[in-house]
């Protein structure tokens, strides 16, 4: 089992998109009330006094859409300023990125992942649940802005959904040929979207690799990061292709992370809901940070068993939260 030193932090559960695989249409989303979110001070206190002392040094800010969080720049500055912080990154839908890229970089953010599942504006609107003016160009502009500012590596997350965007695999992969971008194909997961998943199913990473390999060939490669992606490269390309295969290829033995939701629940495994700790309520009820630290240490010890023994029940069970509420 890997050393667990990577914490994914959901700053907010709200998002200005409603992507099919994250916040499915028709699903009732009970948004967290403002007073139930971890405050800036609570989050920073947990990081400084609980997570860093037990070995967490790498942090990723997620959502919902993290750029909707008030004072997100200030939070980034504070987390980046911790001497123990080795890596600070973010996953965003890119909608606000063209306006904020420079400030994010200046605050100390150095790596960024941007979600873009299609190069077609109509398909984009379908995926994000948008019935008004297309936002595709704004996201594309955000990607360009992040690249120009200097985020490196710049990664683009792609979820392939059968019958929706699976015809674009080669076009998306081709973005890496002349650009130092890193496209990551993520297998579609049944978390909070059972109806869509049952209707559409999913495409394995190996199937995607075969499509790309037939066109250009593929060689193994490497790109810095904390994730479980298997990295490949089109021969001669500037960028790389990553494949995250949580459905088809168990990588529990490589898991190095936990997830902290916007309302303070610490989740040891994405694939099931066993072992979660409500850190926010404990903190507000006067439980000392020393005791919380002990609880997190204990959960770290249980994580291998949770990962492996509960994997099957997790991928077939009922989830009480959508991906947006978990933090991805």
UniProtKB/Swiss-Prot annotation:
Q: What is its EC number?
A: 4.1.99.22
Q: Could you cite one Gene Ontology molecular function of this protein?
A: GTP 3',8'-cyclase activity
Binding sites annotated in the UniProt record for GTP: 8, 60, 91, 155, 257-259
Q: Which Gene3D superfamilies match?
A: Aldolase class I
The role this protein plays is: Catalyzes the cyclization of GTP to (8S)-3',8-cyclo-7,8-dihydroguanosine 5'-triphosphate.
What is said about its interaction partners and assembly?
Answer: Monomer and homodimer.
Protein name (database record)? GTP 3',8-cyclase
Source organism phylogeny: Bacteria, Bacillati, Cyanobacteriota, Cyanophyceae, Oscillatoriophycideae
